[in-house]
Regions:
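A cross-kingdom feature that marks ATP-driven nucleic-acid transaction machinery
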Residues: 1-21, 32-34, 39, 48, ...
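Short glycine-rich substrate-engagement loop in P-loop NTPases that contacts/grips substrate
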Residues: 68-97
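Loop/turn-to-beta-strand initiation segments
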Residues: 98-101, 123-128
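Short regulatory helix/loop adjacent to the ATP-binding pocket of P-loop NTPases
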Residues: 135-151, 166-167
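Conserved glycine(s) of the Walker
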Residues: 45
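Conserved P-loop NTPase "ATPase switch" module shared by AAA+ and STAND
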Residues: 96-113
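Structural recognition of the conserved hydrophobic beta-strand(s) that form the central parallel beta-sheet
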Residues: 126-132, 153
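Interdomain hinge/linker elements that couple catalytic modules in large macromolecular machines
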Residues: 2-11, 160-328, 338-344
Length: 422
């Protein structure tokens, strides 16, 4: 690889980092002497977290010539091969005799990257890697890296970070001030519709920006990466998954839905397509806590990793967006520990259950009319089956009250406050 070209790429990236607008994300912390793999949805803010690390290093006395930042999506690197990795090390030694700090953005584009990163870690170099596909965490790659890297899963802004990025006060005092509360409510409505993609905040035409991100994920991270030929089938499948938010749905049912509208695709292909979408962090699923372990994957509920993505598909928006926002919030707080509850035997039908936090959560746009009995009744049924204390919550769009019965105490919480609860 031409060394002068690599230097040009590195210096250009330095300029990008110097000029970048960076919002602090305190929930992401990094140990000084560790190497990291940052994974997550495309445009979620992984690169910006690396920029922040670089700036902290510079503020601590590290020279820019020690910073080797390479984005492998740069078109000047389209011919880069694993044999060229050594040239990066050579260029670093040409730029500085001091320790180098290596930042590799979207490195999974280069086959064989993991062996190079293992060698770097073995040589006690400081390395930070990002990628937009879960294949970076596959068993084979994890074995190669052998515990030498810590993993951070990066998501679009949560609501707290969203308000921080917009410089909107949202502490407990602001929630009780009429004007401040009104501003937070207004931005919560926007967040519900458009989600938390950091760069989307720069645009008036947010929907168009989010649509372009979706097309990049679908065409690049799913269809092209996995060699899918029946792209129409996967487009319709994603739409049907969006329409099924709030409901559990099996592969067999999805296959039947697609078949009924004239789309010829096998059940095994549907299973593959859904896994590809998960690998690209476009969607995630939760399982029925009551189901036997071997059956939990058979009837999951699917959600989109950002509300803005889900909103691209929906006609009937309100409750679906509300439930999706709660699902995203809960999975950020309690990774791999969020379920739904459904039991034909007891009649229990609960939207979310977080066992470690002992939280039982229903979601309803409003609890007026029939919704009151439906939502509270399910929580009462669950309370009758457990002996340990739990928190019982109904998340609504804007209603707030406390319901106390002889059986259970239920907090009715508006989405705005639920999303801001630490």
């Amino acid at each position: 690889m031409n060394h002068e070209l690599l230097k040009s790429i590195i210096y250009d990236q330095h300029e990008v980092i110097r000029n970048a607008d960076i919002v602090s994300r305190p929930s992401y912390t990094f140990e000084a002497d560790a190497n990291y793999v940052l994974v997550g949805l495309r445009r979620a803010g992984k690169s910006t977290l690396l920029y922040k690390i670089v700036r902290n290093l510079i503020a601590g006395g590290v020279s820019w010539d020690q910073i080797i930042y390479i984005n492998f999506e740069d078109e000047r690197l389209s011919e880069f091969r694993k044999e060229d990795f050594n040239d990066i090390l050579s260029v670093q030694s040409e730029l500085s005799s001091a320790q180098g700090y290596f930042f590799f953005d979207e490195i999974q584009i280069v086959p064989g990257w993991e062996k190079f990163c293992r060698r770097m870690a073995d040589a006690r170099e400081r390395v930070y890697v990002t990628g937009s596909n879960a294949s970076m965490l596959s068993r084979e790659i994890a074995t190669t890296l052998g515990g030498r890297y810590l993993t951070k899963y990066v998501t679009p802004y949560n609501f707290d970070e969203y308000l921080t990025a917009l410089d909107i006060p949202h502490d407990s005092r602001a929630l009780y001030q009429t004007k401040a509360n009104g501003r937070i409510r207004s931005h919560c409505a926007d967040y519900l519709q458009y989600g938390g993609f950091p760069e989307a905040l720069r645009y008036t035409a947010r929907r168009e920006y989010i649509s372009s991100v979706y097309q990049k994920i679908l065409l690049g991270d799913i269809i092209a990466r996995n060699g899918i030929r029946n792209d129409y089938a996967i487009r319709i499948l994603m739409k049907k998954l969006a329409e099924s938010v709030k409901s559990e749905i099996s592969y067999t049912k999805l296959h039947g839905i697609l078949k009924s509208i004239g789309i010829s695709v096998g059940k095994e292909s549907i299973i593959d397509y859904i896994q590809y979408a998960k690998d690209a962090y476009l969607i995630f699923s939760i399982q029925n806590f009551y189901a036997r372990f071997a059956e939990r994957e058979s009837n999951p509920k699917y959600y989109f990793s950002d509300n803005g993505l889900l909103n691209l598909f929906l006609d009937d928006k309100n409750t679906s967006l509300l439930e999706n926002a709660v699902a995203v919030c809960l999975t950020q707080k309690y990774p791999a520990d969020v379920y739904y509850l459904k039991s034909p035997k007891t009649g229990i039908d609960i939207d979310f259950y977080a066992p470690s936090a002992k939280q039982v959560i229903q979601v309803a746009y409003s609890i007026q009319g029939d919704a009151y009995e439906r939502e509270t009744g399910n929580l009462k049924k669950f309370a009758a089956t457990v002996t340990e204390p739990h928190s019982y919550i109904i998340v609504t769009y804007e209603e707030e009250t406390t319901i106390e019965t002889p059986d259970v105490k239920i907090q009715v919480v508006p989405l705005m406050k639920f999303l801001l609860t630490k």
